[in-house]
Amino acid sequence: MSDQERETEEDEGGDPSDTAPMLPQRLPDHQASDLMSPGWASLAARGLGTLLFQGWALARLLLHLLLPAAVFLLVLLPAAAVVYLGFLCHSRVHPAPRPACRALLSDRGSAAVIVLGFLSLPPLLVLASAARARLARRLHSLLPPPTWSPGPHRQSDGEKQLCAWV
């Protein structure tokens, strides 16, 4: 820009920044290499570590929730199926039961199947609890114990303190 053009611009109230390039200039090579310095790598590693830690915590939470649900569902499914079959074939639930139900079960038979299904629930609950405890013991590294447990606690001086619930 010549001196005369600058004077004209200043007279018109133009700012020299109006003629500045809109895009930033390319970084020199030594500044571009700063982006790949060990500081950036450690920052990226810390960020990745934080994401992995939160992902691991989420996986443990899902395992805590889904493991008992899956075990109890699988173990209690036969009892639920028997109860459903009993209700499906009973004439008071369905006024006109299917011919296959009539051939297999009368109303008394359907009631007996319903009672059998409900009576099989407690032993199956015990079996499901035992299976869940065994799986939790095997997966102990993935399922750490809870941080708080009720019962007597040791004080720092070795005395026992009993927590009473009111």
UniProtKB/Swiss-Prot annotation:
Residues 1-28 are annotated as: Disordered. InterPro entries: TMEM88. GO terms for cellular component: plasma membrane. It comes from the Eukaryota. It is found in: Membrane. Belongs to the TMEM88 family. This is Transmembrane protein 278. It comes from Bos taurus (Bovine). The gene is TMEM278.
